[in-house]
Structure formats: structure tokens, C-alpha cells
């Protein structure tokens, strides 16, 4: 993939090696840039849309900001995603998040106590997520929990996983879906992210391998206006204000 690769820190060797490993090539004409920068003494990776600097940078931060607030003051076990994957009482299902993205839904589940393995196929998003996890693992408050409950797998698609060895209670899918125009502008950060990733044109191909990996259920997060994934009706759905969780039970 071609993208601008910019290093604003003194040590560029690690950044160069990471980009090479993921097949990223510097393209000075690209409006997107993956940047290694340093803020308050901490090195991190950011995604920037250079022609729209007001949109700000996209980076993964599980330690502070929105995610820290959600961990401390969010709904916890009462959150819709927790109910959708089957968190109940002492039951904390193991989860494969097969479309990990920036890791936010996985973080909610990990904070509750679920063990979540993440799969992300886009090389830039993979590096952003890997970088966010690296910093979270080193945090004195949540580092131990994160190392135990959130693991980024060295694969890029769930078809690379072996159903006889790499199964989980739940496989979670949240494929990118074309947003309605008014909702696409709600979060500036999402505009940058969607410009990079676009819609998952082959997302319908995720359901069958997900069903093979799941021991109990597959949970698919969809906008409330979206059709069922792969045009396959779920056993039931949980609805929220703007989304729904379609739930496909295994062995029913």
C-alpha cells in the first residue's frame, strides 16, 4: 500500500522496519500519512489526512481519553455489546474480534474480563492497533489486564485460523458499512479512518468462517438501516439507538 510515511522522532529505524514488514511504501503524493511522533515524551503512531488537518490525527489510546472514561464510567456488563456476546453472571465468553479496527469494542469486552483475540487485515490499521496495545501493555494501571485479555493475532483474516485450534465462544464482526451522509460527518476521526479503509466490499464472506470458529454464537454489529450480513437472517437481534447486534447461534 502507498501512503506517506513520516517520522518525527529521532529514532526512525523501528518505524522503517514496521512499515517494511507490512508492505507499506512511501508515496509523497498521498494525502494520507502514517506518522511516528512524540507527545509528552511518549512515542506513538498516528494517521493523518494532510489535506484536512482540522480533522486531527487518528491513533489508538486505551490508557487515557475516551476509552479510559468508558472503562471507568461506562456501562460495563450492562453495555449492549456485553449482552450481545453473552456476558451474564460469572460467564465471560472468549471472543475473536475478526474486524478489530481501532480495538474499541474489544477493549470494552476486555475491561469486563473477557479474553479477546483480535484480527485486523488492513496493514495501517494493524500498526495503529499494535502501537496502542504496546503502550497499554506498559501502563501501570491497566497493563496486566490488557496483556491477559487483549491479544492481536499475527494473521490478517479469520480464514487463516484453524477452527479446531483457534476457536472461541464468540466471533464478533463489525465490518465497515457505507454511512448515510449526515452520520458520516458526526465524528471527524471516522472520516479519516473511512478514507483509509473504505467499505468492506467482501464482508459477506466473513460470516461462514466465523460460524466455523464460534462455539456458541457469532455477533454482527450493523447500522440500524443495514441489511443482514450475507443476506442471512439471525436467530435474534439486540437493538440500540443507531445500531443492532445480529446474533447467530451455533448448533441450533
UniProtKB/Swiss-Prot annotation:
It comes from the Bacteria. GO terms for molecular function: rRNA (guanine-N2-)-methyltransferase activity. Keywords: Cytoplasm, Methyltransferase, rRNA processing, S-adenosyl-L-methionine, Transferase. It catalyses: guanosine(1516) in 16S rRNA + S-adenosyl-L-methionine = N(2)-methylguanosine(1516) in 16S rRNA + S-adenosyl-L-homocysteine + H(+). InterPro entries: 16SrRNA_methylTrfase_J (IPR007536), SAM-dependent_MTases_sf (IPR029063). The keyword DNA-binding does not apply. The keyword Transport does not apply. It is an enzyme of class 2 (transferase). GO terms for cellular component: cytoplasm. Its EC number is 2.1.1.242. S-adenosyl-L-methionine binds at residues 104-105, 120-121, 174. PANTHER family: RIBOSOMAL RNA SMALL SUBUNIT METHYLTRANSFERASE J. Belongs to the methyltransferase superfamily. RsmJ family. HAMAP family: 16SrRNA_methyltr_J. This is Ribosomal RNA small subunit methyltransferase J. The gene is rsmJ.
